[in-house]
């Protein structure tokens, strides 16, 4: 189902939600951190979704063991490097990796700016080693409140030339976008792109807010947009993309089943919706699964899957020249 003549992208992929179970085991042993299991087989149920979670917040707890073992900046650098290696193994030509430096720093009180620098270094080394193109998106974890998000933003801005965009993720219902207006004003002043998790746990009004108040150029998940035809029309008119994550939306109980997922409706409506993974290690999926298994189960035709692949590059945070160069590189391969 993947068109090998086109660039394959994943533009909604959490670096801190893609820490390998083996790496969690290795780092736990290295730093003498107590883990809930001591073998790979018995650890996996603790760090990977094995059945549908009741809600988004429950799903997010599966990510916690991955960051609990980040006891040094070298550990952060390692998981960043491995994220690029995983992308290369999946055949991705271009990936946008998003990460919350405060979340990664929290368990061991690492310097947040140091975490940002370690991630930048690990991703750069990975790109040089594996030939994948990547950009970094900084996340503010809204779950920890406005002040914590300000610390994350300051750390990200200290390395602004290596960050492409700002995102807001976490507890959408408990911490609405209205709390973070000044944060996003600073991000836009820095020249960053804006993408926001919205319409995942909350309704279409959260998406409107992300666009109108925070300046979102893309929406993460955005499943509730299907409830508001005027919003879908607006997304089409303004070319605001939706970063769809099929399997993730089932595992978080955001959508009841793949057959109920609105991605097909978005594509039929002309919305620039793309296929992405979200938290591949936690979910136990990869981009190939999303194209070959999840997308057909969501009712997408072969042509719609191809359109979603095209959309992934179309709405990527790259210049027109960079997109053209990537298309030419893949076509010539």
Swiss-Prot record:
Pfam families: A_deaminase. Substrate binds at residues 14, 16, 170, 279. Binds 1 zinc ion per subunit. One of its GO terms (cellular component) is cytosol. It catalyses: adenosine + H2O + H(+) = inosine + NH4(+); 2'-deoxyadenosine + H2O + H(+) = 2'-deoxyinosine + NH4(+). InterPro entries: A/AMP_deam_AS (IPR006650), A_deaminase (IPR028893), A_deaminase_dom (IPR001365), Ado/ade_deaminase (IPR006330), Metal_Hydrolase (IPR032466). Keywords: Hydrolase, Metal-binding, Nucleotide metabolism, Zinc. Its EC number is 3.5.4.4. Zn(2+) binds at residues 12, 14, 197, 278. The record marks 221 as: Important for catalytic activity. GO terms for biological process: adenosine catabolic process; hypoxanthine salvage; inosine biosynthetic process; nucleotide metabolic process; purine ribonucleoside monophosphate biosynthetic process. One of its GO terms (molecular function) is adenosine deaminase activity. The keyword Secreted does not apply. Belongs to the metallo-dependent hydrolases superfamily. Adenosine and AMP deaminases family. Adenosine deaminase subfamily. Catalyzes the hydrolytic deamination of adenosine and 2-deoxyadenosine. This is Adenosine deaminase. It comes from Salmonella newport (strain SL254). The lineage of its organism: Bacteria, Pseudomonadati, Pseudomonadota, Gammaproteobacteria, Enterobacterales. The gene is add.
């Amino acid at each position: 189902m993947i068109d090998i003549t086109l660039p394959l992208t994943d533009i909604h992929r959490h670096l801190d939600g893609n820490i390998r179970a083996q790496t969690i085991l290795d780092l736990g042993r290295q730093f003498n951190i107590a883990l809930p299991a001591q073998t790979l087989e018995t650890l996996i149920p603790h760090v990977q979704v094995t059945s549908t979670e009741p809600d988004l917040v429950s799903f997010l707890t599966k990510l916690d063991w991955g960051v609990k073992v980040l006891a040094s900046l070298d550990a952060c650098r390692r998981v960043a490097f491995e994220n690029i290696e995983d992308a290369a193994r999946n055949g991705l030509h271009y990936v946008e990796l998003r990460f919350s430096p405060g979340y990664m720093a929290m368990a061991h009180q690492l310097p947040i700016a140091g975490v940002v620098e370690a991630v930048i270094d690990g991703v750069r080394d990975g790109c040089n080693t594996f030939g994948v193109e990547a950009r970094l998106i900084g996340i503010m974890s809204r779950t920890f409140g406005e002040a914590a998000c300000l610390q994350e933003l300051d750390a990200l801005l200290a390395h602004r030339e290596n960050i492409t965009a700002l995102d807001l993720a976490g507890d959408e219902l408990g911490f609405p976008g209205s709390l973070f207006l000044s944060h996003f004003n600073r991000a836009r002043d820095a020249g960053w792109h804006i993408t926001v998790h919205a319409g995942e746990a909350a309704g279409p009004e959260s998406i409107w807010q992300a666009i109108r108040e925070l300046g979102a150029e893309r929406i993460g998940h955005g499943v509730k947009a299907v409830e508001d035809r005027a919003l879908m029309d607006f997304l089409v008119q303004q070319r605001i993309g939706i970063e769809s994550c099929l399997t993730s939306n089932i595992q978080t109980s955001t959508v009841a089943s793949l057959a109920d997922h609105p991605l097909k409706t978005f594509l039929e409506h002309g919305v620039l919706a793309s296929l992405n993974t979200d938290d591949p290690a936690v979910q136990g999926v990869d981009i190939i699964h999303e194209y070959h298994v999840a997308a057909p189960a969501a009712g997408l035709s072969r042509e719609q899957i191809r359109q979603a692949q095209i959309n992934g590059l179309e709405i990527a945070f790259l210049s027109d020249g960079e997109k053209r160069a990537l298309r030419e590189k893949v076509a010539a391969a």
